[in-house]
């Protein structure tokens, strides 16, 4: 009788513990495997989106793809390939997760005189207003310090965008705004402001932190409330799955401040 009880207890432990055993094993292998095991244990039956899987394995994938590209003479692989279809299929919200619209290389090229050319403008990031919430993730341009620390050779392999977790959101009163941002050009600091939207808009001041509790960033978020006059072929409509005049389309500017204006 005692042996039967012992066998029953052992079988129960084998049934209950597989998720924990899987997580413990994955933690001893690699951070990416640990993250995937945690996802399976916490959300059984829900597949991890391809964008998250690619982000976890991005560093390894760039190294292998880069070697192949150098041998074949092709350009570097694309930094990140977010799948909007996966985000639209998520059951947690009717709105897709935020994603990047433009991909640019964060590398400065020198002209014939050896003087560095001005840095390219940061990539524009479009997303829906549902993403401006505490706990959501926003892709923002990678800080220039990241590219400098990585070196000029490795900077081409770095994705121009980096995911930040929203920690706080503060709505700015008003319907028209200007965004002000400081830039360094030719060793001199320049602080400029420009209109944030041509039509009615909503604005937010967002405090976000990089992955793993990294550097914090203050971002100005402007949501265009009326997109009825936008070009119907605008890439934001295609990627976000919305139509002109529908849901508000938002964009973020890192390290910027936003101020309301009174237009008579």
From Swiss-Prot:
Domain spans labelled BURP: 37-263
Key word Signal present: yes
Tissue-by-tissue expression: Specifically expressed in the tapetum, connective and endothecium tissues of anthers.
Key words of the record: Signal
Signal peptide start and end residues: 1-18
SMART domains cross-referenced by the UniProt entry: BURP (SM01045)
InterPro entries reported in the protein's UniProt record: BURP, BURP_dom
Domain of life of the organism encoding this protein: Eukaryota
Protein known as: BURP domain-containing protein 15
Name of encoding gene: BURP15
């Amino acid at each position: 009788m005692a042996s039967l009880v012992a066998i029953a207890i052992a079988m129960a432990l084998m049934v209950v513990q597989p998720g924990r055993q899987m997580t413990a094993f994955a933690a001893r292998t690699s951070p990416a495997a640990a993250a995937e095991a945690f996802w399976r244990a916490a959300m059984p039956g829900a597949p991890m989106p391809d964008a998250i899987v690619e982000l976890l394995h991005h560093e390894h994938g760039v190294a292998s793809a880069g070697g192949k590209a150098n041998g074949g003479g092709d350009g570097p692989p694309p930094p990140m390939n977010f799948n909007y279809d996966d985000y639209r299929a998520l059951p947690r919200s009717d709105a897709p997760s935020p994603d990047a619209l433009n991909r640019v290389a964060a590398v400065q090229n020198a002209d014939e005189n050896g003087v560095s050319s001005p840095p390219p403008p940061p990539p524009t990031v479009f997303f829906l207003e549902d993403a401006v919430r505490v706990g959501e993730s926003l892709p923002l341009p990678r800080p220039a310090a990241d590219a400098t620390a990585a070196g000029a050779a490795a900077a081409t392999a770095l994705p121009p965008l980096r995911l930040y977790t929203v920690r706080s959101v503060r709505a700015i009163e008003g319907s028209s705004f200007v965004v002000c941002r400081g830039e360094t050009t030719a060793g001199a600091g320049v602080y400029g402001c420009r209109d944030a939207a041509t039509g009615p808009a909503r604005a937010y001041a967002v405090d976000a932190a990089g992955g793993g509790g990294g550097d914090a960033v203050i971002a100005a978020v402007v949501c265009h409330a009326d997109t009825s006059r936008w070009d119907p072929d605008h890439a934001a409509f295609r990627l976000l799955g919305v139509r002109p005049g529908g849901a508000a389309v938002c964009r973020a500017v890192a390290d910027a401040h936003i101020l309301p204006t009174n237009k008579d």
